[in-house]
Amino acid sequence: MAIRKLNPTTNGTRNMSILDYKTNLTGHAPEKSLMKILKKNSGRNNRGVITTRHKGGREKRFYRLVDFKRNKDNIEAIVKTIEYDPNRSANISLVTYLDGEKRYILSPKGIKVGQRIVSGENVDIIVGNSLELANIPEGTNIHNIELQPKGGGILARSAGSYAQILGKEESGKYVLIRLKSGEVRKVFAKCRATIGIVGNEEHSLVNIGKAGRNRHKGIRPTVRGSVMNPIDHPHGGGEGKQPIGRKAPLTPWGKKALGVKTRDNKKSSTKLIIRRRKESK
């Protein structure tokens, strides 16, 4: 999908860029039977307490029911549309099975309207088809990867993401995959994945341009802790502009920030990770 840069007619549009949806999307109205109302939570829990900061005030959305399991086996489906989904960075495609059922799936890169796709154990290695990892050859790019058999896709679902199959264990229980982050891990061979790369890979190259676009998405401003009062943040207080007064930066709740590992050491899936993801610089 192409990126269109706007003319600098105002300060807000000076560096703004947008995705040119007309070049890729079909422009159809979403399927009403696969939509439901999405309630706004504004980062609050059931008690009204803020659990996620910097959220609130977004546009109304309807949630699209996307099929991450791809469990309708050996029945061909025809791709009818490629649509925008406000709830994720990737686009979605409406597919109609030969028995009449309609479902939304993640739209892979290169998929076209009218293309036929299918799920099953021994289907062809074609973009959009879904099958078990044990039946996918090494070196194939995949997305929408399950972590538990029949549990639905968990990994590689955002725009432009994918994983690559590196090899298979002799026992046949696990398949080795490399994620886009550089992490290498084992996944059960009975888990399913979809062939191809998730589309709309230019999503990360868009320049927001002005604060109002983030407010439409429900992203509120982020305030520095050093300009707060001491009661609000460990970095707060002092006369005028002051250093944080600590050996290392802290979170608003007093825990160390920047460089602290947050993964639970007792997590059972840690033993399946062969190589950790690349450290950010």
UniProtKB/Swiss-Prot annotation:
Source organism, top-level taxon: Bacteria
Ribosomal protein recorded as keyword: yes
Region (Disordered): 213-281
One Pfam family it belongs to: Ribosomal_L2
Classification via SUPFAM superfamilies: Nucleic acid-binding proteins, Translation proteins SH3-like domain
Gene Ontology molecular function: rRNA binding; structural constituent of ribosome; transferase activity
Keyword Ribosomal protein: yes
Keywords, in A-Z order: Ribonucleoprotein, Ribosomal protein, RNA-binding, rRNA-binding
Entry coiled-coil feature ranges: none
One Gene Ontology term, aspect cellular component: large ribosomal subunit
GO biological process, one term: cytoplasmic translation
Record family assignment: Belongs to the universal ribosomal protein uL2 family.
Subunit structure, interactors included: Part of the 50S ribosomal subunit. Forms a bridge to the 30S subunit in the 70S ribosome.
Protein task: One of the primary rRNA binding proteins. Required for association of the 30S and 50S subunits to form the 70S ribosome, for tRNA binding and peptide bond formation. It has been suggested to have peptidyltransferase activity; this is somewhat controversial. Makes several contacts with the 16S rRNA in the 70S ribosome.
Stored NCBIfam families: rplB_bact
Protein name (record): Large ribosomal subunit protein uL2
Lineage: Bacteria, Bacillati, Mycoplasmatota, Mycoplasmoidales, Metamycoplasmataceae
